[in-house]
A protein has these predicted regions:
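Membrane-cytosol interface segments of multi-pass membrane proteins
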Residues: 1-218, 320, 325-326, 346-390
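Hydrophobic alpha-helical segments of polytopic membrane proteins
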Residues: 179-196, 253-273
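Membrane-interface segments at the starts/ends of alpha-helical transmembrane spans
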Residues: 219-229, 351
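Loop-centered beta-sheet repeat module
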Residues: 196-204, 223-224, 236, 245
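Membrane-interface micro-motifs in multi-pass membrane enzymes
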Residues: 70, 158-166, 230-245, 290-294
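Alpha-helical transmembrane segments of multi-pass integral membrane proteins
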Residues: 233-234, 241, 265-376
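Conserved protein kinase catalytic core
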Residues: 59, 255, 339
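Structural signal for the C-terminal ends of transmembrane alpha-helices
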Residues: 85-91, 122-123, 175-182, 245-255, ...
């Protein structure tokens, strides 16, 4: 899965990944007002993905949500398209070089850190892969190309396949945003639904044909080359990303009052709660993974992209501050927690009774440290070095 994203991959004032977060100060000249509630949402999404990978005990009432939290990877891609378009779509000129360097500066330093921390995992990869697969993964993964090979998408850092998709989406964004888009809200809404439906066609065909010849309905533990292609290949997420861009344009075209946004936020959240409480376990996994809930997520984004009590709750400063670390949390949590458990760190420290919560806290602390001591300084250094010399 991933989030990223991916703005600050996971910065609403810049972009979103799965998995960066928005700033909350006054907008710079030429920039739109920040949307801190969307950063708060990222906090909730990222924590659910952590729980999906490492499910906490004694939270059975939340298991229907936690066990389906893979759906939030699509939410991150939706946010990525929305926030990028929100910030860049109406600029008269989009300097592609500056845009791509800015995206690289956000993603790659922490990505390299995640690979360095995960170096021990290469030993495990060596034992379960053929030599050809191992050395191919060793080339594809540092170059963010692993997502194009369904059998190696999770090589080295299981969750980092999402960055392969982000690279493709970022490469395409300057061209997508300059397409002649509809102007009216009704046509934009129709386009949004159409693009979403097109994105679900491959997943629907998979359900009808079952090309992997699975013995039963697919679930999170199922595997097969076609299913892995749908789950990990960058192409599978283009439509969700384009829905995000369309949603940003719809957001601009609509005239929505604060009360209407509140209704959208409460209504979409109520439907989502009802869905996870009642029918999520009876809904085909392949469709959920492919973005079945994207329209509901889109309504929620519209509801939170303005002033109302629900948006204010998600914009609470502690939640926003955590939201600014979600890219690092997403990228680092999987192998960090696995390594902590591999070496029985809580038990050796006499803190086994506090596990898994102390392990979650350690992963979060690492994400905070990486955000402030690696991601931001490295990004500033890259942008400074890439700036034209006067």
């Amino acid at each position: 899965m991933h989030p990223n994203h991916t703005g600050s991959s996971l910065n609403v004032s810049e972009e979103a990944v799965p998995l960066n977060a928005t700033t909350t100060g006054a907008p710079a000249p030429g920039r739109r007002p920040p949307l801190p509630a969307l950063t708060g949402v990222r906090t909730i999404l990222a924590l659910n993905i952590v729980f999906f990978h490492f499910t906490p005990p004694h939270m059975h009432y939340l298991y229907p949500l936690i066990n389906a939290s893979y759906v939030f990877v699509g939410f991150f891609f939706l946010l990525s398209g929305f926030v990028l378009a929100y910030n860049y779509a109406d600029r008269p000129v989009l300097d592609k070089r500056k845009f791509w360097i800015a995206r690289f500066a956000r993603l790659y330093p922490v990505y390299l850190l995640s690979l360095a921390i995960s170096f021990k995992m290469l030993q495990a990869e060596w034992h379960v892969r053929s030599h050809a697969q191992f050395f191919t993964g060793l080339v594809l993964t540092p170059t963010l190309m692993q997502g194009w090979n369904q059998s190696l998408a999770t090589f080295w850092n299981t969750v980092a396949w999402t960055l392969s998709a982000e690279v493709v989406l970022y490469a395409a964004f300057p061209y997508l945003v300059r397409i002649r888009w509809p102007k009216s809200a009704s046509r934009l809404a129709a386009l949004l639904i159409a693009v979403w439906a097109v994105g679900l066609i491959p997943h629907t065909l998979y359900l009808l044909i079952n090309p992997d010849h699975l013995p039963g309905p697919a679930n999170r533990y199922s595997s097969g080359p076609w299913l892995r292609t749908l789950k990990y290949t960058p192409i599978a997420y283009i439509c969700i990303f384009v829905v995000g861009i369309t949603l940003a344009k719809l957001h601009t075209a609509l005239s929505i009052s604060a009360r209407q946004r509140l209704a959208l936020a409460i209504g979409s959240m109520a439907v989502l709660v009802l869905f996870f409480a009642t029918v999520v376990t009876r809904t085909p996994y392949v469709l959920l993974h492919g973005g079945l809930l994207v329209p509901l997520f889109s309504v929620l984004v519209l509801g939170l992209s303005g002033q109302n009590v629900v948006a204010s709750a998600f914009a609470w400063r502690p939640i926003v501050l955590l939201g600014q670390t979600t890219f690092c949390l997403y990228l680092l949590h999987f192998n960090t927690i696995n390594l902590i458990r591999m070496y029985h760190v809580p038990q050796r420290l006499g803190l086994g009774a506090l596990d898994p919560w102390i392990t979650y806290a350690a992963a979060l602390a690492l994400a905070v440290a990486a955000t402030f001591w690696v991601e931001r300084p490295a990004r500033a250094w890259i942008l400074r070095k890439s700036a034209p010399q006067s």
